[in-house]
């Protein structure tokens, strides 16, 4: 392939889409205590909305329990309310110093709901990867129209780009299968 066509930017962007999907998957409750579960929760503190991990230490002392220790004890009630109001369906217990967050078993219905959600997240990731491919294809075709690359180089670049796209979509599908298996584990 010609040196004119560099797919490293496309690969970087596809990798970013994959990492975004994996990060989203980490925030989905599976019945096991995982501090990443609280990553999406923001707390109203000091006149602004902040991620919970910025205002508290989060630990997992047991497989089914998270503990949240605020750096500022005045934020206990605010953190508790933010967790209670979130879509996680968890019931925080405030003892005046720390918040204990027991992670209950998932019901069959909730598991199916979460599987639908992770499938949607995976599809969004696939769409992101395909959008990167589309953008890169436009660039390759533009280079061909402007005469900067030959038709053979264009075909080779498109084939290489398709291989890259397929590889990243496969990785997203593998991450999805792993998360689905984790969610169905009783």
Swiss-Prot record:
Its main location: cytoplasm. Gene3D superfamilies: 3.30.1360.40, Ribosome-recycling factor. Keywords: Cytoplasm, Protein biosynthesis. It is found in: Cytoplasm. InterPro entries: Ribosome_recyc_fac, Ribosome_recyc_fac_dom, RRF_sf. GO terms for molecular function: ribosomal large subunit binding. One of its GO terms (biological process) is translational termination. One of its GO terms (cellular component) is cytoplasm. Responsible for the release of ribosomes from messenger RNA at the termination of protein biosynthesis. May increase the efficiency of translation by recycling ribosomes from one round of translation to another. PANTHER family: MITOCHONDRIAL RIBOSOME RECYCLING FACTOR PSEUDO 1, RIBOSOME RECYCLING FACTOR. Belongs to the RRF family. This is Ribosome-recycling factor. It comes from Rubrobacter xylanophilus (strain DSM 9941 / JCM 11954 / NBRC 16129 / PRD-1). The lineage of its organism: Bacteria, Bacillati, Actinomycetota, Rubrobacteria, Rubrobacterales.
């Amino acid at each position: 392939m010609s040196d004119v066509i560099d797919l490293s930017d496309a690969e970087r962007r596809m990798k970013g889409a994959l990492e975004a999907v994996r990060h989203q998957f980490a925030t989905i409750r599976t019945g096991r205590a995982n501090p990443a579960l609280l990553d999406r929760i923001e707390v109203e503190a000091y006149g602004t909305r902040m991620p919970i991990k910025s205002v508290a230490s989060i630990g997992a002392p047991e497989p089914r329990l998270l503990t949240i220790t605020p750096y500022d004890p005045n934020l206990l009630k605010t953190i508790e309310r933010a967790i209670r109001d979130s879509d996680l369906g968890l019931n925080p217990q405030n003892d005046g110093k720390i918040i204990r967050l027991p992670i209950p078993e998932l019901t069959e219905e909730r598991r199916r709901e979460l599987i639908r959600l992770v499938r949607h997240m995976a599809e969004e990731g696939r769409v992101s990867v395909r959008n990167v491919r589309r953008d890169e294809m436009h660039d390759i075709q533009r280079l061909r129209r402007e005469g900067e690359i030959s038709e053979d180089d264009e075909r080779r670049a498109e084939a290489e780009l398709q291989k890259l796209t397929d590889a990243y979509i496969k990785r997203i599908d593998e991450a999805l299968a792993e998360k689905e298996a984790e969610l169905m584990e009783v």
